[in-house]
Amino acid sequence: MWLALLHALHLPYLVAGAALWCGAALLAAFAFSPLWRKKRPEQGRVLTLALFAALAFLPSSWAAYTLRVYRDNIFPALCLYFFAGMAGMALRAVFEKDKPLWPWLAAAGAGLTCGYLDREDAGLFLLPFAAAATVIVALVLVGKRRWKAFAAQVIPYAMLGVGVLTFCTLNYTHYGVFALSDFSEGSFAAAMGAMMRVDTDSDKPYLSVPADAREKIYEAVPELKPVAYWLEEDAQMENDFRDPGLDDYRAGSFYWAIRRAAQYEGIYADAQTAANYWQTVADKINAACDAGTLPSRTGKRVATSQPITAAYVPATLAETWNGFRHVLGFRDCAPYEALRSIGTDDDIAAWSGYLHCGFNAAANAGEDTPYYSPYQRAIFAVMQGWAWVYGVVLTVCVFCAVVFQLMKLLSCLRKKCTAETVVPWLLLFGIFGIALLRCAMIAFVEVSSFGIGTSTMYLAPVHPLLVLYVFAGLFLYGRPISVKRKDNA
């Protein structure tokens, strides 16, 4: 929908993406402005501008991976709209009692709805923060008897419900299936969950449905035998999806491989046929597992992801730490692509015309590497230098912000605190916690399904959260202790 909108409005893809990101950065800067309400107006404006600049010039926003024509290009901005809306609402509920909250709730709802529709894992990332913020602010509003503001807390969830129902209705109208996605929910997810139930002799962590489990399933479910040829014998399928090191399909590629095999067999002739087919597969596998005909290692599941087990915990924790360090250092944030495009001239022309945006298809003479002019290389060098400096500063500041916030917690435990003290502390704690949650989510997928290495593309929503945490945390709690003692004297 985003690409179609840009095409209809004749907006260049890269320009529109940058505008979306800058809009989110501006909203976030104004969202946190109540924190410096006691500063002189000119100082407050400087702080707001500084936060906007820190977000707008994030190296992750121009990284080659995040500039791809892909849903993750806009996902960080959509998430930032959501977090900015919730933060702006929470801070105004405490510090600006005469200001309406609904505009901030509407902004949060727009970010939540669009983010949820953009990525299937957005609910696990955004909804915990939304729920916690809503409960905390609701307690504050009830205590102050602000009933209209309390009732307005439903706005983000109502917008999310309307957005999801609208898409489900459109899918039902056009395809005959009332679902938001035919991948992460419904009959295909049920079929994948059923296949992952079948026990296996393999102990390789990346394999969700190993070869020995597939052989058992083919025998128990005749409907899958037509796709077995494509999965087990077709050379092109194996080249596209099979891991040569494992000599099998990783979890992160198997579901795409079996969907393509089903497409080749005409199962995706229409959505209803595909839905019925996968539901039949799911029902037969689950029935065989329940009856003992097929060996089962889990209960009934509806999911495309691997089941969470204790075996993944050490690797997930280690990869979470790797991902967090990856974010702090702005690694893999080069603003250019090191590999030359494999697109044909006709493909590139078609995409360029649709997106109103130029593509670089030039190669260095005698090499299979992309060509960049000396001017471009100079700009890239400046941008990478900025990323290096930003990474060092962010790493130091995150450490300091965590220490100062913990010191503030210790001081709050020794005395009675008001909502003006507690809510900002909890807000920053939530922002930092949700950043770690995102790192952990991506870490689990990496160690259980993908095996592609730590990816900036999937971690890009974390960078702005750490910037918000550092900027607000150091402003609130980062004054030297000696100054605070002098103020209290």
Regions found by a protein language model. Name each.
Residues 43-47, 98-104, 142-159, 483:
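Membrane-interfacial entry segments at the cytosolic side of transmembrane helices
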Residues 82-103:
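Membrane-interface transmembrane helices that cradle and orient dolichyl/undecaprenyl
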